[in-house]
Amino acid sequence: IVKGAVDAVCAEKKIKVFLVGKEEQVKAELSKYTYPQEQVEVVNATEVIAMAEPPVAAIRGKKDSSIVKGLYMVREGKCDAFVSAGSTGAVLAGGQVIVGRSKGVERPPLAPLIPTEKGASLLIDCGANVDAKPSQLVQFAKMGSIYMENVMGIKNPKVGIVNIGAEEEKGNALVKETFPMLKACSDINFIGSIEARDIPAGAADVVVCEAFVGNVVLKLYEGVGSTLI
């Protein structure tokens, strides 16, 4: 994280990075690098949220943790974004409790970029909502499309929903109900169902699924990658 922050401020002169954590440890790591010091500020946080801790209880109980302090900085307008390598559950819970959701957003998804033959695709959702509703999958599709177009620079990104076949009538109840809703969306480039084998081929720029399926896809990617490498 510290190296990433240093690389960021060295590459972009207009940004400022706040490193939130145990001050002595962070400064010791920073001392290894040369960087524009006016663009980096260390914010001391004395507590740590462990990976195994219940997220909501940890957010409420550890006010001086880096996750809680960082999220409050976003809420108070001191920062525009928050990045963490800590507990995913705590970041999600804290994001909703402290920062809040954007207007109209039902649930926040987890959306990593995954490698394909044609570049990166966005897998959304991969772990936040294992029992998602059709309306939420539609929102994920729209959010993913906006991200891929505006952040990744892909014009009119292709959106596909993960299914057990390419035919519209296939799938479980969730996919069957979501499919026509996605098809009716005029603001996304919905290409229909995609099978798991289509994902590494880059068939879709935005791969939509509920978190149970998405997490299986993500962990399979990780396992295959480590096996082959």
Predicted features, each with a name:
Residues 35-79:
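Phosphate/nucleotide-donor binding subsite
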Residues 93-127, 184-194:
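Short, acidic/small-residue loops that bind anionic groups at enzyme active sites
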Residues 1-51:
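N-terminal glycine-rich anion-binding loop in soluble enzyme alpha/beta folds
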Residues 10-12, 34-35, 59-63, 73-77, ...:
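Solvent-exposed alpha-helices and their adjacent loops that cap or buttress functional pockets
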